[in-house]
Design a protein with these regions (language model features):
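Cysteine-nucleophile protease catalytic domains, especially the papain-like/related folds used
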Residues: 2-97
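Alpha-helical structural motif
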Residues: 40-43, 75-78, 99, 197, ...
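Noncatalytic regulatory segments and standalone regulatory/sensor domains
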Residues: 145-238
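Active-site-adjacent substructure of cysteine-protease-like catalytic cores
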Residues: 32-37, 42-69, 96-147, 151-154
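Short alpha-helical interface elements
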Residues: 68, 72-73, 107-108, 128-132, ...
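Charged/polar, solvent-exposed surface patches and flexible loops
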Residues: 46-49, 81-85, 101-105, 168, ...
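Predominantly the structural core of cysteine protease catalytic domains
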Residues: 76-117, 191-199
């Protein structure tokens, strides 16, 4: 990954990616039974290889998925695993200015920014684009406020948006609503590679296996399913 490049006054393109030529990672291959997992897992699965790291090495945590009584674990890549494997320090971004201004500042420092946004303004969001309002997470890697253009990872790929979508995504200061949750990614080191990465990943697998659920999560879900179905059947599905 090259260092951040200024493409114009007040704009940053961190990775120099092209939406037309970006190819999703193999974990997001179209022939998979479940192409997408959840917004946070998916965005990291694309961001990691863009930063030069194999996401497969960070998957040991998945053995800890459990049935939590009312849902299956909404799992995420553990931040401590990303640090240990890839030298990535993920920190919460304290928002006091506009999200646009913070994104520009952090990208200028070489830090990708993960932002909770309204998928209403994401052209790649399919049926919810300009219709529904659903919270999701994107990873910002390029921004040009003057051109009102934004480059980001979301779900299974790299995308760009501009114009009215940019305006909607980055609401002006003082607009109603709360600040979104944001994180930025600092690269503390080059990360592990080759045999060292394999060894560290296997070590994490042993760690997570020791903490895996004591009972079968699918069996626990099966036992709770009749009660859940009864509640759902009594609700207005609209």
């Amino acid at each position: 990954m090259s260092s951040a490049s200024r493409v114009g006054t007040g704009s940053v393109d961190l990775l120099g990616l092209d939406e037309a030529t970006w190819r999703p990672h193999a974990l997001h291959a179209a022939d998979r039974t479940w192409v997408e997992t959840n917004c946070y897992i998916d965005v990291w699965t694309e961001l990691l290889p863009a930063l030069g790291h194999p996401p497969e090495a960070a998957l040991p945590f998945t053995v800890r998925q459990d049935f939590e009584g009312d849902h299956f674990t909404f799992f995420k890549y553990p931040l401590e695993d990303l640090q240990a494997l890839f030298g990535l320090s993920v920190q919460e971004l304290a928002i006091y200015d506009s999200v646009e201004a913070h994104t520009l500042e952090q990208l200028g420092r070489g830090h990708p920014v993960l932002i909770e946004v309204d998928s209403h303004w994401l052209p790649d969001a399919g049926p919810t684009y300009r219709k529904g309002h659903v919270k999701t997470t994107v990873a910002a890697v390029a921004i040009d406020p003057a051109a009102r253009r934004f480059g980001y990872f979301h779900n299974t790929g790299f995308h760009t948006l501009q114009g009215a979508d940019y305006d909607g995504l980055f609401q002006p200061p003082g607009a109603p609503g709360m600040f979104p949750y944001c994180e930025f990614v600092k690269r503390d080191g080059p990360g592990l590679t080759d045999e060292a990465l394999t060894k560290a990943s296997l070590g994490l697998l042993k760690h997570h296996l020791a903490l895996r659920p004591k009972a079968n999560p699918v069996a626990a879900w099966r036992a709770a399913l009749p009660q859940h179905l009864e509640k759902l059947a009594a609700r207005d599905m609209d």
